[in-house]
Structure formats: C-alpha cells, structure tokens
C-alpha cells in the first residue's frame, strides 16, 4: 500500500499543512474553496491512487484547512499564488503538474500565467473563468451560516446525485468549518454577497487564458450547479492547447462522482511526454 505522509512546512511565511505520497513526476493537487474545505476533504481518496505513478503533493492553501491564517494578511489571488510558489520552493520542486478543483483550478491558472516556467501542465475541474452571474450553488457556499443545516444545504449543490452525501461527510466538513476561528476566516476569505442582487463572479479573464502556453485538460460535470458547464466551453475555446472532457449526470465533484474515469484521464494526461 502507498504511504501518505501528512506534515507541516513553512511556505511564504505560513505554517502549511500538506499531504505527500509516491515518487516520480511531481503533481500538485489544489483544493476548492467552500466552507470546511481542505486538501483531505477534496482529495483523500485519489491521493494514494495517483501516487502509484506520481509524486503527489496536496497542500491546504493559505487560510484553509490546517494551514495558518494570519489575521492581518490580505488574502487574494496574489497571496495565494505566492504561497503556492513558496510551497514548491520549500519542497525543491522546479516544475509541477497541477490538478486544480474549482478555486484551485483558478489558482493553478493564475500561477501558470504569472510563473509559466514553474507549471508543466494543468488539469482543471469545475474551474471558473471569465465573468458569469453568481449561481445558487456558489451563493450557498458563501452564505454558510455556521449550522449543520447550513452545511447540508451548501453541500447539496455539489454532486448531481445527492445520495452520495453521507452524514459523515456533512459532519466532517461541519466540524472543519466551525472549529475555533474557522467561520471568521471563511468570511474573510470568501465574503458573502450583499443583498439579493445577482453579483457577477469574476474568474481568470478569457483574454488572459488565450495567452496560456501550457497544455490543459478541462474536466467538467454537465450538471454543475456551482460553476456552470458553459465556463468549461469558454475555457476550452480560449486556452489554445486544451482538451475538454465532460461528464453527463455529474455535478461539481468530478473527482468524487467520477473517480475511476478521473484517475484514468489524469494519469494518462500527466504521463504524456
């Protein structure tokens, strides 16, 4: 069996929690941004599988999971990119493949655009881009109110078939989201939308994506209620060297809802010369 090691490193002045396993070509898994999210919540089942072929690193991004949140730091894409690069530097990783889920995909893209030599290629799952009206699924994440019912409501938008949502999963995310300081941290990282207007969500601009030199594999659930499938089409049209694989009857959790296919596609893509 593959040994997954969880440890703490210093990266960009943040005490950083990460999971690591396997040998070979380095692949970094970047988690999404809902309440109670962490690398473990997004990736625990796929880390040992991907580690059969790759050196897998799955960090908790600054402010999320068990990684430090500094009360006086300004958490924005600039800080998150600097933290990600800090992780690569701390681990001595010159160039890595990235698998990014949702917000993690946007972070991977932002890093690839600002530090192109550090990123080898990208797998983007349910990743926002361009501009689009706030979805009910995104709003439910941002409006999480600190109750177990609120968590159940927020998580209900992720999969297409919500029978995969277990009480244990809700409980685990709820505990993570309500540990001391976590709710305040989440409010700081992801401010709730004001009033009931439909604010615009802004991802990486499509014009910027058109300049991306990297290969990208875009994976998206057709029924995604958090980041609509149309985003994947726009991304595929914009990123010159991209391929798109869409799953029917699948929501925002491709790596959980279509785990076997996800593993096959990512393994094949990351192993290419």
Identify the residue ranges that each predicted region occupies.
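Active-site loop/oxyanion-hole signature of alpha/beta-hydrolase fold enzymes
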Residues: 48, 58-99, 264
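Conserved HGGG/HGGXW glycine-rich cap/lid loop of the alpha/beta-hydrolase fold
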Residues: 14-66
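Gly/Ala-rich beta-loop-alpha elbow adjacent to hydrolase catalytic centers
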Residues: 100, 104, 108
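Catalytic active-site module of serine/aspartate enzymes centered on a nucleophile-bearing elbow/loop
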Residues: 242-273
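Short beta-strand/loop motif that positions the catalytic acidic residue
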Residues: 212, 218-220
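Acidic catalytic loop of the alpha/beta-hydrolase fold
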Residues: 223-227
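Conserved alpha/beta-hydrolase catalytic His-Asp/Glu region
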Residues: 145-210
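Flexible "cap/lid" loop of the alpha/beta hydrolase fold
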Residues: 109-113, 119-153
């Amino acid at each position: 069996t593959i040994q997954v090691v969880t440890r703490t490193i210093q990266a960009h002045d943040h005490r950083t929690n990460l999971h690591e396993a396997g040998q070979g070509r380095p692949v970094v898994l970047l988690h999404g941004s809902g309440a109670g999210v962490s690398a473990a919540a997004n990736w625990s089942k796929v880390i040992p599988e991907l580690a059969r072929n790759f050196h897998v690193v799955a960090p908790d991004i600054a402010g999320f999971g068990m990684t430090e949140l500094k009360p006086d730091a300004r958490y924005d894409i600039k800080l998150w990119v600097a933290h990600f690069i800090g992780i690569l530097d701390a681990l001595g990783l010159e160039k890595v493949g990235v698998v990014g889920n949702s917000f993690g995909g946007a972070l991977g893209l932002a890093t690839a655009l600002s530090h192109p030599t550090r990123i080898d290629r990208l797998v983007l799952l349910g990743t926002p881009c361009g501009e689009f009206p706030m979805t009910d699924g995104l709003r439910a994440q941002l409006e999480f109110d600190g109750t177990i019912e609120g968590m159940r409501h927020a998580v209900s938008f992720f999969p297409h078939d919500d029978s995969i949502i277990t009480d244990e999963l809700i409980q685990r995310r709820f505990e993570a989201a309500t540990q001391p300081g976590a709710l305040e941290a989440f409010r700081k990282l992801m401010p709730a939308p004001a009033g009931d207007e439909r604010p615009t969500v802004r991802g990486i601009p499509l014009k910027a994506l058109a300049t991306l030199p990297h290969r990208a594999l875009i994976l998206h659930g057709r029924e995604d209620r958090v980041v609509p499938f149309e985003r994947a089409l726009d991304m595929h049209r914009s990123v010159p060297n991209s391929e798109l694989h869409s799953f029917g009857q699948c929501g925002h959790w491709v790596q959980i809802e279509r785990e076997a296919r996800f593993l096959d596609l990512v393994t094949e893509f990351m192993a290419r010369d």
